[in-house]
């Protein structure tokens, strides 16, 4: 991707907007936005990617401003066409007793002359190149004939034609990426489009300690099919579904956020509230619409957190007819995903990523469709030490703190429990400093007085206050289920 070409197109779009040539300006803006989008997909550095996304957002705002100007000018044009003929016939018969002036004849003459003038002016202005500014100031009907004259005046015709071609291709791509919700309620389409994670969750693989097997599997299921589409065909098609199983607080949702940040696919964040409605039959439509939108925006990852609340075991006594229909539609749509097997392009895939704390409550048919079922366990000793370093990287730690030794003491704690311990320990110094002070004295404290390093004693006190949230019996249930139904 030529960065100079991106800068030139952005500059030309702004120049055309300043000159009033809004039609050409919109073409350049659409092209440069699409070029930056393609450039972001090729970047691997997250910091550079975020900067380019900010630039793209600024250009998109400028493009919207130009569009609003064009729509305003078009409304003026329509108003003039409507307002001109109306007062003309009303002026004549207003005073029948007075000798009629010759104004009606004079009004009719110019109206008839003005009608063919806009049609003939562009034909006369195709040849001269010095009159294009006047045409731009008078209306947009004269913009298109001015493009070749502007290019010839600048003397870089080949470069301009290439930029125009790229801009038009970018505009076509932007138009293609708008989902057509014909046949569905517009409110349902808007509700699902809001669940597309467009902003960056800012969670990277390095922010998650341990869990190397889970990271490797998610890269294989989401990233590699886009990098090697020729390899992932036939029996080696990408995985259609991945289920993350484990006790609460072990990082299942964090892994999903990392997938949304790192993998560059369209990411749908779906919960039970997204797919439920009080109207009969609307929940099934939402499920079908979700997968149709996912196939349209492919490659796509659909993350369903706490999937046991949506697709529990069928045939139980507390099951309702409406929930059974939703489960059936979800199972049908998941079985029909099969993007890499049926599509010509294996990278146009739809992968369902699910997480649950109760895998034994999931329906058997859904368990079959989630081809990979991985266990997200409690962190190991190495993982606990890494978690302590990640949580304390913005806090000053005293020299007497040995994180490796403390990691051995918190065996059996989940990732969320370790985060709570670190948060409580980092606040111990502040609690000691404000003890016995009045509110006025607390407000008068400086920031440096509160920034005290965390000591080993603070960690010991926090550990006494916070107990682990996962019992040994729960771990045995997860391990028993994984030994019977696991698929790593």
From Swiss-Prot:
The lineage of its organism: Eukaryota, Metazoa, Chordata, Craniata, Vertebrata. Residues 144-167 have a biased composition (Basic and acidic residues). Belongs to the AAA ATPase family. Katanin p60 subunit A1 subfamily. A-like 1 sub-subfamily. It comes from Danio rerio. One of its GO terms (biological process) is spermatogenesis. Its EC number is 5.6.1.1. It comes from the Eukaryota. It catalyses: n ATP + n H2O + a microtubule = n ADP + n phosphate + (n+1) alpha/beta tubulin heterodimers. Residues 84-184 are annotated as: Disordered. It is found in: Cytoplasm, Cytoskeleton; Cytoplasm; Cytoplasm, Cytoskeleton, Spindle pole; Cytoplasm, Cytoskeleton, Spindle. Signal peptide: none annotated. Gene3D superfamilies: 1.10.8.60, P-loop containing nucleotide triphosphate hydrolases (3.40.50.300), Phosphotransferase system, lactose/cellobiose-type IIA subunit (1.20.58.80). Regulates microtubule dynamics in Sertoli cells, a process that is essential for spermiogenesis and male fertility. Severs microtubules in an ATP-dependent manner, promoting rapid reorganization of cellular microtubule arrays. InterPro entries: AAA+_ATPase (IPR003593), AAA_lid_3 (IPR041569), ATPase_AAA_core (IPR003959), ATPase_AAA_CS (IPR003960), KATNA1 (IPR028596), KATNA1_MIT (IPR048611), Katnal1_chordates (IPR028594), KTNA1_AAA_dom (IPR048612). Keywords: ATP-binding, Cytoplasm, Cytoskeleton, Isomerase, Microtubule, Nucleotide-binding. GO terms for cellular component: centrosome; cytoplasm; microtubule; microtubule cytoskeleton; spindle; spindle pole. GO terms for molecular function: ATP binding; ATP hydrolysis activity; microtubule binding; microtubule severing ATPase activity. This is Katanin p60 ATPase-containing subunit A-like 1. The gene is katnal1. CDD domains: Kp60-NTD, RecA-like_KTNA1. ATP binds at residues 246-253.
């Amino acid at each position: 991707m030529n960065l100079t070409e991106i800068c030139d197109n952005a500059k030309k779009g702004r120049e055309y907007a300043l000159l009033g040539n809004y039609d050409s300006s919109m073409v350049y803006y659409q092209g440069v936005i699409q070029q930056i989008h393609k450039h972001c997909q090729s970047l691997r550095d997250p910091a550079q990617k975020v900067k380019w996304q900010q630039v793209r957002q600024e250009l998109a705002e400028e493009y919207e401003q130009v569009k609003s100007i064009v729509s305003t000018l078009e409304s003026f044009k329509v108003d003039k066409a409507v307002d001109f003929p109306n007062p003309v016939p009303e002026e004549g018969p207003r005073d029948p007793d007075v000798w009629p002036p010759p104004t009606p004849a004079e009004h009719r003459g110019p109206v008839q002359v003005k009608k063919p003038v806009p049609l003939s002016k562009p034909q006369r202005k195709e040849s001269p190149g010095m009159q294009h500014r006047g045409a731009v100031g008078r209306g947009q009907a004269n913009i298109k004939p001015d493009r070749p004259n502007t290019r010839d005046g600048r003397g870089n015709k080949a470069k301009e034609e290439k930029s125009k071609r790229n801009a038009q291709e970018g505009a076509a791509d932007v138009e293609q990426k708008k989902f057509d919700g014909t046949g569905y309620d517009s409110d349902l389409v808007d509700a699902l489009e809001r669940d597309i994670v467009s902003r960056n969750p800012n969670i990277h693989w390095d922010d998650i300690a341990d869990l190397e097997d889970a990271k490797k599997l998610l890269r294989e299921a989401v990233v590699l099919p886009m990098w090697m589409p020729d390899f992932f065909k036939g029996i080696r098609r990408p995985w259609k579904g991945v289920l993350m199983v484990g006790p609460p607080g072990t990082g299942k949702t964090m892994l999903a956020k990392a997938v949304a940040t790192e993998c560059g696919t369209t990411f749908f964040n779906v919960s039970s509230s997204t797919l439920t409605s009080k109207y009969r039959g609307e929940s099934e439509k939402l499920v079908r619409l979700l997968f149709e939108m996912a196939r349209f925006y492919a490659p796509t990852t659909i993350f369903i957190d706490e999937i046991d609340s949506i697709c529990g075991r069928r045939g139980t006594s507390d099951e309702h007819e409406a929930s059974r229909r939703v489960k059936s539609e979800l199972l049908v749509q998941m079985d029909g995903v099969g993007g890499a097997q049926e599509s010509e392009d294996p990278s146009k895939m739809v992968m369902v990523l699910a997480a649950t704390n109760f895998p034994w409550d999931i329906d058997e048919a859904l368990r079959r469709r989630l081809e990979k079922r991985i266990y997200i366990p409690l962190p190991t000793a190495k993982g606990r030490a890494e978690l302590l370093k990640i949580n304390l990287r913005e806090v000053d730690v005293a020299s007497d703190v040995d994180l490796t030794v403390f990691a051995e003491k918190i065996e059996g704690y989940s990732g969320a429990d370790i985060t709570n311990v670190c948060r409580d320990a980092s606040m111990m110094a502040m609690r000691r400093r404000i003890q016995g002070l009045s509110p006025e004295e607390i407000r008068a404290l400086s920031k440096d007085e509160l920034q005290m390093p965390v000591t080993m004693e603070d960690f010991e006190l926090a550990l006494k206050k916070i107990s682990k949230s996962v019992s040994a019996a729960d771990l045995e249930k997860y391990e028993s289920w994984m030994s019977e139904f696991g698929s790593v």
